[in-house]
Amino acid sequence: MTRVSLLWAVVVSTCLESGMAQTVTQSQPEMSVQEAETVTLSCTYDTSENNYYLFWYKQPPSRQMILVIRQEAYKQQNATENRFSVNFQKAAKSFSLKISDSQLGDTAMYFCAFMK
């Protein structure tokens, strides 16, 4: 069975708008899983905003950034897109990406992003 490498840089990004800073942090530097396994990537963020969007992007070896999934903060239901789903915990400021049935094509660097 082929190994799927989910390399992801430790990313801390800050978005400055209206004098307020929003910080997004990913804690896991790299993950490798067997093909067909399920993997969860974690992200936390800090904001005082009530209405915002969270995104997961992937950057495969071709270097292009691809939107995987997005979550609106005002929605209670977690977003789902094919084999990708999120666990959005607004009170805990946590936003995890779950990749089910991982495939070789999932090999990429993954980024969590925030937008007001």
Curated annotation (Swiss-Prot):
This is T cell receptor alpha variable 38-1. It is found in: Cell membrane. Keywords: Adaptive immunity, Cell membrane, Disulfide bond, Glycoprotein, Immunity, Immunoglobulin domain, Membrane, Receptor, Signal, T cell receptor. The gene is TRAV38-1. GO terms for cellular component: immunoglobulin complex; T cell receptor complex. One of its GO terms (biological process) is immune response. The keyword Disulfide bond applies. Residues 22-116 form the Ig-like domain. Glycans are attached at residue 78. Residues 1-21 form the signal peptide. It comes from the Eukaryota. InterPro entries: Ig-like_dom, Ig-like_dom_sf, Ig-like_fold, Ig_V-set, TCR_variable_region. Disulfide bonds join 43-112. V region of the variable domain of T cell receptor (TR) alpha chain that participates in the antigen recognition. Alpha-beta T cell receptors are antigen specific receptors which are essential to the immune response and are present on the cell surface of T lymphocytes. Recognize peptide-major histocompatibility (MH) (pMH) complexes that are displayed by antigen presenting cells (APC), a prerequisite for efficient T cell adaptive immunity against pathogens. Alpha-beta TR is a heterodimer composed of an alpha and beta chain; disulfide-linked. The alpha-beta TR is associated with the transmembrane signaling CD3 coreceptor proteins to form the TR-CD3 (TcR or TCR). The assembly of alpha-beta TR heterodimers with CD3 occurs in the endoplasmic reticulum where a single alpha-beta TR heterodimer associates with one CD3D-CD3E heterodimer, one CD3G-CD3E heterodimer and one CD247 homodimer forming a stable octameric structure. CD3D-CD3E and CD3G-CD3E heterodimers preferentially associate with TR alpha and TR beta chains, respectively. Pfam families: V-set.
